[in-house]
Every structure is written in C-alpha cells, then in structure tokens.
C-alpha cells in the first residue's frame, strides 16, 4: 500500500526560513519610512478572473505618493468583475468562455511520438516525456514566423513546477522504484508547444517540428563564472560543464532576442542528506528527509550523502531557444543561485541587458543582473551570449525611501577568502551567503517582478506573505506590515535613478497592502479601495500599461 495521501502533496519549503543572518528586514525599514497616509489609494479596480483578479494603471507611482491627485485612474477593460467565491469551479466574466487547452498528459506534439493519456495512470516514464507535465506555472508566447508579430500563431513555452506521486501511478507510491521516479522526473520541466488560432478557438498543432519537452534528465550546458568550479563537479561530470535537467520550474522570463527563461525555485525539496549538513547546505534548505518526491531513495543524484555537489547544479536561470528544438538549454550561473521565482528582462539606457529576480522564501532577497555587453537586434548569435557575463547585484532598502544595488563581486565589499569565497564562480554558487555578507535587506517572499514598459526604470515586485511576521525571534509587526502572521502580503515599487535600469540607486515605496475590504481591523484590511485580494504572486503588464496581479 502506498504512503498516506498527505505525504505525496507538495511540501512548501518556501515557508521555511533558511536565512539566519542579522541583516535588516524590510518590515523594520518600512516602519521607519512609511506612514499609513503614504500608501497609494487606488480608485476603480476591475476584476478580471478568479486567478487574475486585479488591474492597476500605476503610472508615476512615486510621484503620486506625495501628490495623490496625480494618480492615474484604473483602465476599464469592458467586463464585469467576478465576485469572490469559494466554489470549486472555473468562472469567467459574462461573454467569455474557458476550456481545457493543454492538460497534464496531453501529447506535446513531437513528430512520431504522441502517446495518448491513459486515465488509469498507466502511461510509462518514456510516454510522460512526450506529454504535458504536471502543475503548469509560468509561460511565455513566441510568435511565428520568428521575428514577426503574429497574434494568431506561435509557440507557447510553459513550466511544469511540481508533481503529485499519488496521481502518477496506478498503485500510487507502492513498490517504489527508479522507473516511478523517472516518470515523476519527466512530469516536471518545460513544454514547448505550437499553437494556432482557428476561427474563434485555439488548437495545439500536432505534430509540430517545434514541439519539445525539457525534463529533469535533459542534457544542459553550464555557462558563466561557476562553470568548471570545484563545487559544480560530480563523478558524472568531472569537468563541471554539463548537467542533467531542470526542475521545480516556477515563474519565467523572456528575452528581446526570442528565448525563454525558466527559473528553478524549490529545487531543494528534492535533495536529502542524512549526514551532517554544512553551512551552504543549511543556507539553501537541504533537508534530512523527503516524503513527497522520494527520488533520493532510488536515484543517487538526489542523495547528497552520495553526490554532494549535485544540489549546487540547481537553483539557476535556464535559457531555452524555443525556435530551435535541437538547441541545448543553458544554465546561466552569472545570474546567481537561489530559489528563483522569475526573471524580468529589460534594457538599460546603453542597451545592456538587465534582469530582475526574486528569491521566493521568507526573509530572502531581491537581485538584478546587468550584462557586460549590449543588446544588438541585428546579431542574435551575440545576444545569445549576453546572460553569460555581467554583474549580479542585491538590493538594500534604506529607511529614508532610498535604495542601492550592492555588487556581489569577488574581492569587493569583503567578499573574499576571509569570508569563505574562493573566486567569483565559487561566490555565485554561494549567492545567498554573499548577499548576507554585504547586508542586503530581508524581504517577505519576493515573487514576480514586472517592469513598466511605458515608464523606464519603474519596477514592481510582489511580496506574497510571511506567516512568521511577529513571531518570537522574527521581524515584528510594523506600519508597512501591520499584522502578525501576515497572510496577505503587499506589492512594492521602486524607480531606478535617472530612469535607467542599470543604475545603482533607486527610490522605493509601497504600491498597495493586500487584504480584506469587509473589516476595520488594520491587521487584515487592505489599502485598495473597492476590491480585496491576498498573497499577490504573478505580476505582468499588458500592452496598455495595465498591471495584472495574480
């Protein structure tokens, strides 16, 4: 008989705390800087759907803090908001329809390999590698033909974040073996599917020369300073240049040159070490048990006692070329190693590439990467190298509303051998420890980041929640987070100096506190008029400059 059902659900290690540093927490910084009157009071808000309920037009947000009359009104999108409900059903506004499109087990569309889904869960591991994975998450659109704007035909790149073992097999987790682990590994990763509009409906093109599945066992290349570092070498890869697979792919990003960025988030859930954990393993949340995935029981890659450096090969941003199904995905170590939620890409004033990233765990940090070289729209081959070299920064939020980006560079700010760093590559494997050392500001689970396409240097970040707020030994309640056991979260905004994303200084403020509208309790009340929401996560601008919040 399999393990109890409760043991096969996803374990939320993002809810653990792995940061023991004495760095300032954002709540205490915000308390010194903000007062209740400074929160933006948003007016009319349109509700889009149960999963994307709020739309804001936050132009010139910082100016609006001191000049409330300057706030732009929310844009009406022409449909009626969906009321709050606990019904177990998908609901959309009147005049819209929703239907399943690409379900777990649907054929991806790979030529000559399109297995049908078997509802008794008897599909093999090899069949799963040609089918949609489980638990879809971040995704991005790439028009076809390449280089043209075509809203009716394109490629959809989609993450498959995690799995439920209890649903993958006919007998659940009984008689656990390597083949079962392989099927689970093939149900994670990324799908590339070709989609096309047909009349008023959409269809997945099958077969397609673009169709592809990327899984936990797909060969990948390592790039950047951590390539060939001692901490990246294993018996299977003694040079530290190649790695198998990507997993726990949460949010995403996309580049101006037409590639997909998939982000490895809760990868530490997979690894188990029974022996004593070192400081690096503790800082990244490596555990001594795993009742959810159980790969470490049958696959030594995920048994840290046997393969100690394998965890170091995860926690990166992976670049995939959706237009070239024969290309090798690349893990870009220059962008740092942590629990990447997403990667928001924009261009600096001088055309260098800037990528904003959040580390989605309690009291972790916000980062940005600035490339060494510049984007050239006429040279895609050169652009494909832009994320291999540059400078990684981590944010510090000061109590006067200013902020600065602190470089994580070997030999600067005390980041040297005396602090346990051997080189730039070694430092990037230990990104969290480097951010601790320079005094970055602890945040409340940074999730998605969105760059305003109509206001250069204006950036927004969801801080989803923090149930440890106010607990003994943790950050206290404060003006910016006025509730213990903060279940609602907030959204923050910063504007880079001079409107340049590559700037090293910025001004910050709070866009909105999430919460309820039916209470006068300041510990639970949101600051947005006319609507309520909690635990903001996904964040994206549309072509009108409307900010969509999940």
What residue spans do the PLM features occupy?
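Short, conserved, GDST-rich strand-edge loop motifs in beta-rich repeat architectures
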Residues: 161-184, 268-308, 371-374, 465-485
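Blade-edge beta-strand/turn elements of extracellular beta-propeller
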Residues: 89-100, 113-127, 200-240, 320-337, ...
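Signature of short aromatic-glycine-proline-rich micro-motifs recurring in repeat-based ectodomains
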Residues: 125-141, 238-251, 439-448, 525-540
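Beta-propeller blade signature
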Residues: 188-195, 286, 313-322, 369-370, ...
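Beta-propeller fold recognition
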Residues: 178-184, 188, 201-213, 364-434, ...
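N-terminal secretory signal peptides
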Residues: 1-34
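N-terminal export signals
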Residues: 32, 38-64
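Residue-level detector of Asp-centered blade-edge/turn motifs that repeat once per structural unit
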Residues: 143-146, 255-256, 347-350, 453-455, ...
